[in-house]
Amino acid sequence: MFKFSCADFTFPVLERTAALKLVKLLGFDHVDIGLFVRSTHFSPIDLQAAPQSYTAQVLQDLDDAELRASDVFVQIGVDPSERAANDPSSDIRIKNREVFLRALELCVAVRCNHLTGLPGVFHSTNARERDLETAAEETAWRMKECACAGVQYSIEPHVGSICEEVESARAFLRRVEGLTLTLDYGHFVMAGESSALVHDLLPFASHIHVRGGAPDRLQTSVEENAIDFTGMLAGLKQLGFDGFLALEYVWVDWNGCNRTDNVSETVLLRRALESQIRRLTEAS
């Protein structure tokens, strides 16, 4: 029932082909592609500059590593506030749409049926309601474009976004009918919300990011983890979830996310999740 993938951006200090081969070596058949401006592996800027040749090389690299893409995660700015989906500038939003369409083309070309984006942020120059309206408009447009291509679009609620609490995420879901989530418990638990509250978002999840997390810590080792993955898995099983559990440790100098041994923690967390899944299966 449960399928696992691993993010390429878990191993940013390796060059792309080596990172993909490591993902395969760790026992994964699927990889989450991070199409980030800051990425050392997949760049929306390079994609836009030469879409055909860039896509052909990505396909070749995936084939060489014997991997399939489980998600394409597009981030257009260096950080979430730069060139956000709901940027107040219509010119920037138009340029964002151009990048997004290229990302969608890549998603289709690599035979991936799931694409993740960020919801947007609040801007000091805008009224909060206007930011929410613009975010909803852009999200609805992205969903429509993806649906026409046979791809599921979702947003990832995250620290610093318009959806940084469970309630604000639920409110945004009410604004955009049919929207799904790429759900990472860590962003909520870091801010002090309980796993029990985050469980309420499971019915809207089409993709799950998993890594250790705790209050005030976006990323931790498995040993230090405070996220209720057992409850999460039980909820997903009850819902008949058929998406991916993506192991998504990152290595970046942000919120202490460069203090874990990503190879070891990826292996340990997958083993822990598989053990919990076996117990759930035996109990049913």
Predicted regions span which residues?
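Active-site beta-loop-alpha junctions enriched in small/polar residues
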Residues: 7-11, 36-38, 74-77, 120-122, ...
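Short, solvent-exposed loop/turn segments at secondary-structure boundaries
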Residues: 43-47, 84-91, 126-131, 195, ...
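Histidine-acidic metal/acid-base catalytic patches
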Residues: 1-5, 13-29, 63, 111, ...
